[in-house]
Amino acid sequence: MKYMITSKGDEKSDLLRLNMIAGFGEYDMEYDEIEPEIVISIGGDGTFLSAFHQYEERLDEIAFIGIHTGHLGFYADWRPAEADKLVKLLAKGEYQKVSYPLLKTTVKYGIGKKEAEYLALNESTVKSSGGPFVVDVVINDLHFERFRGDGLCMSTPSGTTAYNKSLGGALMHPSIEAMQLTEMASINNRVYRTIGSPLVFPKHHVVSLQPVNDKDFQISVDHLSILHRDVQEIRYEVSAKKVHFARFRSFPFWRRVHDSFIED
């Protein structure tokens, strides 16, 4: 089996990476950064996101594993003390694949420029590059509202525990193939109104954000943020692709939520 290990880059994570590579050396495991079947992320959810995007073109052939060397993460759920056990389990191939939905973002520009597509594990956000943020929200070709505010966030089910949660969005179980739109400081008064609630869309829905005045936007996809100019439309939909995780034990989603945000 081919595998690779990525590290956060701190001393603890780097040392654990070297120890695991040495451990895999005792088994029929091949280290391969080009075409790995298993990608192990050591660090936190940020490190995991980087690993995901590094291999997003090969998602169908890869299963991911996260080891946290800091706080418990939603993607990094193994502890460093369990690394030896994980090496043995992987060498035996004793795992199941669990799949989570992803978000597809398409940015369309003015005449002459090719559209851009992005894949998000957590979320995509849209904000103005400087002036007022005003867009028409169109759902399945039906004009829904004209939004005015700081911006909008579209998240995956697993991503609802991230930025979406801080915006007051609902938490969604990753088995639900859907996406959730939340507002950032919307303007609501006698003149301007928005729905004022998070919206959840099933996988066959397409949400289009269409600029009203300003066509320059700061668009983020997970940890990547880029200034896009002359934007004509931003389209969101549940991607046909999925991310796969190697699971060796039961660790329910709601247990992760409890341990991360409540923990008695």
UniProtKB/Swiss-Prot annotation:
Protein name from the UniProt record: NAD kinase 1
Record carries keyword Zinc: no
Enzyme class: transferase
Catalytic activity: NAD(+) + ATP = ADP + NADP(+) + H(+)
Binding site for NAD(+): D45, G46, N122, E123, R148, D150, T161, A162, Y163, N164, K165, S166, A185
GO MF: ATP binding; metal ion binding; NAD binding; NAD+ kinase activity
UniProt gene name: nadK1
Record's function text: Involved in the regulation of the intracellular balance of NAD and NADP, and is a key enzyme in the biosynthesis of NADP. Catalyzes specifically the phosphorylation on 2'-hydroxyl of the adenosine moiety of NAD to yield NADP.
Entry EC number(s): 2.7.1.23
Source organism phylogeny: Bacteria, Bacillati, Bacillota, Bacilli, Bacillales
Keywords carried by this UniProt record: ATP-binding, Cytoplasm, Kinase, NAD, NADP, Nucleotide-binding, Transferase
Aminoacyl-tRNA synthetase in keyword set: no
